[in-house]
Amino acid sequence: MSTPVIPDKFLDLFTKKAFAHLATLMSGGEPQVTPVWIDYDGERVIFNTAVGRQKDKNLQRDARVSLSIADPDNPYRYLEVRGRVSERTTSGADAHIDKMAKKYLDKDKYPFRQPGEVRVIFKVTPEHVTSAG
């Protein structure tokens, strides 16, 4: 099965300051939704969190996700990506969160780091892509 492609006309959502709403599953099956900063490597949607947060725990147990990304300039234009985490790594996660801080906050360093916090990157391989607008 081939990986669904993000339509070219929606790739700008990954360069704008668009937040994704990330849905993961709790151990009892309830959905848990969190806004996250997003990135795209041409094949996978990427987000970053701290080890031990609820989304990290959920994704270590169940790799399925859904992301909804609305255009900040036109909320009726959006992208939905359903898929699975294909990679979880701490390698490069500090540099990546700083890159995201530059994009979203215009700060060179992520300003909300907590003492002892370990950052982790998740890469999501799309299995279903829907768009509108």
Positions of PLM-derived features:
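Short, surface-exposed beta-strand-loop junctions and turns on beta-sheet-rich folds
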Residues: R53-K55, N74
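A short, polar/proline- and glycine-enriched secondary-structure boundary/capping micro-motif
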Residues: D56-D62, Y78, D106
